[in-house]
Amino acid sequence: MLKTLRSAIFAGIYIGTAGFGFLASGIQSETYGSLVGAVLFSLGLMAVVGYKLKLYTGTAGFINKNEIGQLFLILLGNIIGCLCLGLMTRVSPMDIQAAAQKVLELRLKTGALRCGLLGIPCGLLMTTAVTFARKGNMLPLLLAVPLFIVCGFT
């Protein structure tokens, strides 16, 4: 249990770092900024897959029925890891607040139901990409992330 939590925390840190890179890359500069950010975000996911860390979105598509209870622990660890990274960004000289605010406002404007529905193709893309990555082919992971971000499936 502790090993799973530790793995999930590190996955959260990697994804938090990827998110920071996404915001810092200039998402506010429309398509090209978000495309660059999406490619940078892929590196965080590649690290999670490469190090075999526990990320909720990468686990949910592969988990057995008898392991469903682990999903809560993984989600908790991911949140802790992201929060740790979020606290570290507070001392960064980069001002990403405006970009983060823009993303948050877009999610709130979209609404929970629509965001949830848009998450379905995101999950399908990521499950497919992770399946390939676990077999040693990282290219689909590199391409799936920009695809779901550019399509707005986040």
Mark where each language-model region is.
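Alpha-helical transmembrane segments and their helix-helix packing motifs
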Residues: 1-154
